[in-house]
Amino acid sequence: ILVQDAPLPLAETASTFSELLLYDNLSDKITYDEKKIMLSEKIDDLYATIMRQSFFTIFEVATHEQIGKGTTIDEISKTYIQNLKEQFGNSVAVSEDFAIEWSCIPHFYHTPFYCYAYSFGNLLALSLFQRYKKEGSGFVPSYIDILAAGGSKKPEKLLAEHGFDISSQKFWQEGLDYVNSEVKAFAALNIYF
């Protein structure tokens, strides 16, 4: 009973995997225009839950180091805007107005260091989904067992019992390959803005 709740990354995995199943089921049943919208929203969601959350976590680590040494709101804001500029590179002009955006993100106050769970959980779900697409119904018992385990085992141990090595770059690459395939599918729709 004390370990029945799934750890944060696995909780994110369950919901994301279900969304992937729904998306996969709908993608062949919708119109071209609906597919453009759905794919655009999917890519936006992948960015927000993987990349943006990863950069939030990087910012949190840096900020906590700053706080330990004594810092100011201005210094934290500089760290945040540098983080945004690194995140977007030269693809987007990041206004200095965003320097204070960090102060409006409730996770930083209410659930510190939660944001990694979005990145981890989403990439884990994407990697598992890629396996599901390869293995089909043979994957289902493993997936149900992973969900049923809740928080009774550490994610790396639980997943290893089902043949998934989350310490392997190859495993995570499967999730990133899914993201890449969605971006390519979107580009193939010849959408111009």
Question: What are these model-derived regions, one by one?
Answer:
Residues 1-6, 38-45, 64, 68:
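Short beta-alpha connecting loops at secondary-structure transitions
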Residues 8-12, 37-41, 74-78:
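An alpha-helix initiation/capping motif
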Residues 3, 17-29, 33, 49-193:
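C-terminal, non-catalytic "cap/extension" segments appended to globular domains
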Residues 1-17:
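Post-HEXXH active-site segment of zinc metalloproteases
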